[in-house]
Structure formats: structure tokens, C-alpha cells
Amino acid sequence: MGKLAGKNILITGASQGLGRAMARRFAKEGAAGLSIVARHADQLNKVRDELRKIDPPSPGSGAASIVAIAADVSSARDIERVVAATLAQFKGRLDVLVNNASTIGPSPMPNLLDYPVEDFREVLDTNLIGPFLLIKNALPAMIERGGSIINVTSDAGHVGYPGWGAYGISKFGLEGMSQTWASELEETGVRVNWVDPGNMNTAMHRAAEPEEDPTEWANPADVTNVFVFLASDESKDVTGKRFQAQEDWKSKLSRTTDTKDTK
């Protein structure tokens, strides 16, 4: 049996990068249902088809129910549709919500003084208001099952880097909102945690830091362990915590390097 056997999971931003890597890992861990959400239907449907080909960890397990929903998480109407379609697919049962969808805004990112207001609002709507509305809409179903909410944050939401504009501000807000949700939901059995995945070799990170060498960054698949932990019953007593996904990856990389050096 996989670590996520019986779990129904909704993931936003699932058509590429970290979201796609999480969806694949969750399927391999035996999730009962996966609702994958992203803006572009063509990319999303390719991921859905990939997931359907993944062998389950044991007979009778695996992602038996997969739904792909093209939607914009900056739209309140789209969010209502996403949650309604997900609950319809899973017969009202939702165990895990992963708020992963994100945008960095204009590239290169302008300084705050020069930031267009409409672009600023779009980033906040996607990175902060969207997760708030997803939690708000999904929460009644999750309270019934003592679910897990995982918000994907950033180091830019923990340290005020110059030049990161609306993105950093939105991630600061997401960390604060995560702490508040965790406190307010503590008595309900729903846990809320947030994860800083670090720099990864994804399209978004390459656009954000074009001067850096992306081959030195982690691949998204390498940092999924913490998400499996938080989605599983292993974390049933963990809430209100911030995790850094790459700590595990870096320690594994160090051990691999040490082994090679001794040969």
C-alpha cells in the first residue's frame, strides 16, 4: 500500500513543474483520487494521461479517479467551479488541498515604484486571494475528514528581497495566512502547513532568475518527499509549521557525493 492510499487530493498549478511532479508522486503513492488544476487545458490533459499510465504501488490501489479541470485560480467563479467539480468527482470527499499555482508577474520583475497596479493585483489574486478562496470553498468537506492543507510558499515570502515586488509580498501574505488558518482550524482536525520548495529547474524559476544556472537547482521530482509526508497520515499531528523542501534533497545529494568521492 502506498502512503496516500484512500486519499483524495486537489492540486493547483499541476500542468508543469512542481505541481506535475507532485501529482505523479501522489499517484505512485496510491492516492485514490487526483483533481489536477491549471490554466491551460492542453498541458493539463497531457499530465492527466501520464497519471493514468502510472502503475499503482499494489493491486487495487493507485489513482483510480483522475479529473483535470482547466481554470484560473485568480477567478472566484473558476474556484467555485473547481471545488464543485472536484467534490462531485470524489462524492463529496476531499482529504488534501495543495495550493501550488503561482505567478511571478512581469518578467523581468520591476521595482515596486514602477510596478503597474494591474499586474500587482493579478499576482496577489493568483498567489494569495486564490488560495484563500480555495480553502474557504473546500473547507466544509475537509472538516468532515480532518484534512490537510498545504500551501506552497517561497524564500521570497520569508525574506524581503529587493526586486521581487508583488511576488514576494504575495508569498509573505501566504505565510501569514497559513499561520492564521492553522490557528483558527486547530480544533477542527484540519491541519495547515506551508512549504518553501527552494529554487527548482522550472520555467517559472528560470524566468525569475535568468542570470542563474538552472542546472545547479533541484529537479521538482527531487523535492516531493515533504509533500507526501504532509498529505499522509504520518503528519496527522503536524500543523502550523513551515518546511523547506530542499533540506532533504540536499542531504541526499551530499551523501551521494560523499559516496562517489570514496570510490
Task: Give the ranges of each region predicted by the language model.
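Alpha-helical segment proximal to the catalytic Tyr-Lys
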Residues: 140, 182-184
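Conserved glycine-rich Rossmann-like NAD(P)H-binding loop of the short-chain dehydrogenase/reductase
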Residues: 31-47
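Residue(s) in the substrate-gating loop at a strand-loop-helix junction
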Residues: 154
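C-terminal helical subdomain
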Residues: 187, 194-198, 202, 210-253, ...
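Active-site helix of classical SDR
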Residues: 135, 170
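Conserved glycine-rich cofactor-binding loop
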Residues: 15-16
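Substrate-binding pocket helix/loop in short-chain dehydrogenase/reductase
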Residues: 108-112, 116-121
